[in-house]
């Protein structure tokens, strides 16, 4: 159930170049039961920036009423958020959207989790949930360069983890698909979040597989009212049918929406 709450900053730190880990505390965490959902953050107390910022949920600790977000500080809004200190309050709306379907993966199966850049964070909570139900997980994390790699060790604690960097400064040189090819990775179900180019490459390979992708889109309202994040359906070539990333997604079965 979506709620709005002022949550307290437990901790915030930079964990890679311009990548921040923010831990917030509040009873809203009790509503976070679906990995892959996101929250909308009001980054400042004044009018500007006007729009909330959508940030995925990386980790949930309901015993402590805490959840973790990872985000890249690159625009005015997220740079402002990066200045928040322990004990300050942050206005949070969420949880929003439909997350990854855990029920599609069965105990004993292998799930491949593929993340690119700031699309990596929601896969961490997903991986923990899958491991808890007896699913074997394999992670492939793609980044531009070594300086922006994060959470490699945390993912490695849950299952086999591979890293690809475009410039080859860490892990496999190239893209996540190069890792799949180099290591002959096979799987029963695929979950992925990242840039459109990466998702298109995976869709081209695995249309016949059981696979789910999470779309990174700029959003306005976050609740399906403003129509700023619509995407068209592949089954309708006329382009008249669409779904909204924020409320119908952000997770969709692979092949359902036009990338």
Curated annotation (Swiss-Prot):
One GO process term, biological-process aspect: 'de novo' UMP biosynthetic process
Binding site for [2Fe-2S] cluster: 221, 226, 229, 246
One term of GO molecular function: oxidoreductase activity
Pathway participation: Pyrimidine metabolism; UMP biosynthesis via de novo pathway; orotate from (S)-dihydroorotate (NAD(+) route): step 1/1
Domain of life the protein comes from: Bacteria
Listed cofactors: [2Fe-2S] cluster; FAD
InterPro entries in alphabetical order: Cyt_c3_hydrogenase_gsu (IPR012165), Dihydroorotate_DH_ele_sf (IPR037117), Dihydroorotate_DH_Fe-S-bd (IPR019480), Dihydroorotate_DHASE_ETsu (IPR023455), FAD-bd_FR_type (IPR017927), FNR_nucleotide-bd (IPR039261), OxRdtase_FAD/NAD-bd (IPR001433), PyrK_electron_transfer (IPR050353)
Keywords in alphabetical order: 2Fe-2S, Electron transport, FAD, Flavoprotein, Iron, Iron-sulfur, Metal-binding, Pyrimidine biosynthesis, Transport
Oligomer and partners: Heterotetramer of 2 PyrK and 2 PyrD type B subunits.
NCBIfam families linked to this entry: PRK00054.1-2, PRK00054.1-4
Family note: Belongs to the PyrK family.
Protein known as: Dihydroorotate dehydrogenase B (NAD(+)), electron transfer subunit
Gene source species: Bacillus cereus (strain B4264)
């Amino acid at each position: 159930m979506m709620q709005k709450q002022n949550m307290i900053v437990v901790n915030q730190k930079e964990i890679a170049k311009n990548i921040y880990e923010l831990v917030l505390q509040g009873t809203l965490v009790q509503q976070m039961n679906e990995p892959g959902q996101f929250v909308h953050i009001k980054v400042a107390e004044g009018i500007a920036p006007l729009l909330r910022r959508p940030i995925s949920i990386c980790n949930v600790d309901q015993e402590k009423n805490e959840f973790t977000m990872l985000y890249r500080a690159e625009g005015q809004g997220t740079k402002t958020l990066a200045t928040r200190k322990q004990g300050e309050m942050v206005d949070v709306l969420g949880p929003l959207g439909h997350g990854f379907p855990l029920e599609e993966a069965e105990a004993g199966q292998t799930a491949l989790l593929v993340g690119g850049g700031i699309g990596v964070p929601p896969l961490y909570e997903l991986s923990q949930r899958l491991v808890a139900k007896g699913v074997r997980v394999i992670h492939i994390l793609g980044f531009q360069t070594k300086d922006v790699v994060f959470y490699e060790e945390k993912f490695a604690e849950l299952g086999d983890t591979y890293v690809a960097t475009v410039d080859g400064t860490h892990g496999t040189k190239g893209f996540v698909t190069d890792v799949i090819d180099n290591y002959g990775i096979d799987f029963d179900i695929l979950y992925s979040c990242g840039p459109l180019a990466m998702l298109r490459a995976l869709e081209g390979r695995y249309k016949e597989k059981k696979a789910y992708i999470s779309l990174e889109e700029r959003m306005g309202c976050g609740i399906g009212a403003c129509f700023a994040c619509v995407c068209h359906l592949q089954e309708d070539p006329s382009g008249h049918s669409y779904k909204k990333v924020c409320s119908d997604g952000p997770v969709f079965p692979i092949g359902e929406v036009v990338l």
